[in-house]
Amino acid sequence: MNPSTTQARVVVDELIRGGVRDVVLCPGSRNAPLAFALADADRAGRIRLHVRIDERTAGYLAIGLAIAAGAPVCVAMTSGTAVANLGPAVVEANYARVPLIVLSANRPYELLGTGANQTMEQLGYFGTQVRAAISLGLAEDAPERLDALNATWRSATCRVLAAATGSRTANAGPVQFDIPLREPLVPDPEPHGAPTPAGRPGGRPWTYTPPVSFDQPLDIDLSPDTVVIAGHGAGTHPNLAQLPTVAEPTAPAPDNPLHPLALRLLRPKQVIMLGRPTLHRPVSALLADPQVPVYALTTGPRWPDVSGNSQATGTRAVTTGAPSPAWLHRCEQANRHAVAAVRGQLAAHPLTTGLHVAAAVADALRPGDQLVLGASNPVRDAALVGLDSHHIRVRSNRGVAGIDGTVSTAIGAALAHEAAHDGRTVALIGDLTFVHDSSGLLIGPTEPTPRRLTIVVSNDNGGGIFELLEQGDPRFSDVSSRVFGTPHDVDVGALCRAYHVESAQIEVGELAAALDEPGPGMRVLEVKADRSSLRQLHAAIKAAL
């Protein structure tokens, strides 16, 4: 067995021992040793291999697989720009704390700076965005040292896994594992081959690292009128469950929900912030109010204080006191009023908007389903229409909240969800998000494909979120409609046909029935929506409060 093949097989075996079950592979010549080793592991049923031609979407497919499976996922590619195309996914994985392992094949390092083809300084390319950038030395053709090399390769692979999963830091995230490979890049003929050097007995990892966790208890008195703000990565806090909670869709479902717009009707005396809230301006205003003490509870090491207003930080609350019944009743009434205001104005509004589409999707979900939300308006709309996330799983790329890669994320999340659960996956995304990652629809005929994924495209022909921001002020209409609205006139049905994906254009009133249809496989449901009246609709909702 030649050195590159031996090294690749050892690395793949150790990744599997460390918990990797899904790997995304992009074709190339330099990563051929890894490709052959991964294909062998796939045939043996040890991993599930997903082959993609676009590294950018491959990275987001891996993110979807990782967040839904709760396990590290690798994406392997050849050298050069193939590595650079992982940039957006690596950044998202960094801030969302997703265990993404970039297996970047490289030319031998002595070729750097010589003009060698498809060669660049790719080790360390991702800079501060990765937990670690780790390299293996070139595999030596030294049979007499194979035991020592085997130990070195396996130990390095375990180091990669520990960094990605955060087992020593409680801070999961992306890792670059750069592997220079020398020719020959394909396996030797079998009769002259040799078995892969062995790992630990019983399939154990070479170096086991038990997971560490932070524990920073924070004393909090619940007697003052308190609200909880739960953002992405909030975690569960049973001793806070009785408190009124503004929960973003990706946070754990609250026992005592409080609509984000209800904050306008209340004057809390203190706030407990969980995770990283990013969606609602009333929430941001409350967290920045110097008259309201804020206690921030997070599960990771990042500083959780955008406004500089937090009085203390920790990982869990040690509570004393109890909220007054009068405060709880007042919050319950405010929540009911806000929910009714939103639904009432939706019913009265003459045009279909993204909010209407979000309400139809939210109302059609069933226990066991998984919901993937686009990072622009859809995740906000789901919160505003009162999504009940009990008994469903909600995903959204909230690390840096870009719209890129959302189709691929949804496909990865669906594949992981179906491997462990019976429920469907429904993705709600906007048209720009869909078009931006339309290449994610490309799944080859030999590749694993979601069995129950429906992508709902709320199509208002452009960037609806800008209608609600300062750029959407009517004063700027002569400019904003073009440079922010970015109308595109893409034929969604034709785009889906190009990728052999079933699609249909339906009205919002038909969405619930369409989602209930069994429809095995992956499909797209397009709902035409209007964005020109979004500003008017949101103003009417605020007035109804």
Curated annotation (Swiss-Prot):
Homodimer. The gene is menD. Residues 195-205 have a biased composition (Low complexity). This is 2-succinyl-5-enolpyruvyl-6-hydroxy-3-cyclohexene-1-carboxylate synthase. Catalyzes the thiamine diphosphate-dependent decarboxylation of 2-oxoglutarate and the subsequent addition of the resulting succinic semialdehyde-thiamine pyrophosphate anion to isochorismate to yield 2-succinyl-5-enolpyruvyl-6-hydroxy-3-cyclohexene-1-carboxylate (SEPHCHC). Pathway: Quinol/quinone metabolism; 1,4-dihydroxy-2-naphthoate biosynthesis; 1,4-dihydroxy-2-naphthoate from chorismate: step 2/7; Quinol/quinone metabolism; menaquinone biosynthesis. InterPro entries: MenaQ_synth_MenD, THDP-binding, Thiamin_PyroP_enz_TPP-bd_dom. Keywords: Magnesium, Manganese, Menaquinone biosynthesis, Metal-binding, Thiamine pyrophosphate, Transferase. CDD domains: TPP_PYR_MenD (cd07037), TPP_SHCHC_synthase (cd02009). It is an enzyme of class 2 (transferase). It comes from Mycolicibacterium paratuberculosis (strain ATCC BAA-968 / K-10) (Mycobacterium paratuberculosis). GO terms for molecular function: 2-succinyl-5-enolpyruvyl-6-hydroxy-3-cyclohexene-1-carboxylic-acid synthase activity; magnesium ion binding; manganese ion binding; thiamine pyrophosphate binding. It comes from the Bacteria.
